[in-house]
Amino acid sequence: MAKKKAVNKRTSTSTPKLPAKKTVVRKSTKRSPAAVQSELKKLDREIVKLVNKRCAMTIKQIKSDPEPRKAMFDPKSDEELRENIEKFNASGPLTNNAVRGVFRQILSSARRQIHPQRVAYLGPAYSYTHLAALERFGEGADMVPVNTIGAVFEEVNRGNTEFGVVPIENSTDGRVVDTLDMFTRLPLRICGEVLIAIHHNLLARCERSQITEIYSKPQALSQCREWLARNMPQAHLHEVTSTSTAAQLAATKPGAAAVASHQASVEYDLQIIVEGIEDNANNVTRFAVIGEEVCDPTGSDRTAILVQIAHTAGSLADTLQIFKKNKVNLTWIESFP
């Protein structure tokens, strides 16, 4: 019988060779402060160059117009610019309002070099009407503060200023009676409008517990009446002609405070004791730009019509039928007085 050979099976204990490690060299993406500063300097140089080029082109455009003075206030062109900014600024990080602010100053400076526009507004400086005027005309315009809404109309009517800015309606308090009254007295026209979000602040130079008097214009006090009743019941409320006048008083009278804007706190060196005290967080005021001439249509306009009708039954209904017949929608109707 044949013998079977024994076969010993051994398990290999040798270690397999691993692939050689590759050394990866990563370049740092962090730039030195000096490199960043150098890049910023290049950008600043280019921005200044482009801003001046835009200003020069605006001057050239206005001067080439058959009516240069009229071209300086062109709502249609301004509307097109607003639409372009929203389209070009889709990626940010600047907000559309911030970019519009840059262009506003460019256009305002260009117009000033041709003819400084004079604009009357309900003052003093940094009232809400002043802020609305700056929003529309920029800092290149000559701003003329006056003490009353009626005085704004008079300045424009006498030719002392080309335009005026007045409040016409508030989302909380409704119509501004003084403005509507002046439209019945003087033959001026609405040339444009400015919408301003109104955020009231309690301003003072003393501690909150030391406030005994609060000043502001009637509309501002009305828009904060609930907050003031809850939080400042011990303080006496006083009506003045504007929020800026209130800020001036708060800056000079012991124990006095004002309901006014953030900008007023800076202008009159006041502390913001409480921010945003308006009862309605969506508090918006519509300001009218008034002048003597009718502006060209932009395609997205509002039209204001002042009519006087007979004091007879059905006269108002007959007037409204004209709008219905011509398929014109009405968004605001006021009976005055």
Predicted regions and their residues:
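Domain-level signature for soluble enzymes in the chorismate/prephenate branch of the shikimate pathway
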Residues: 2-337
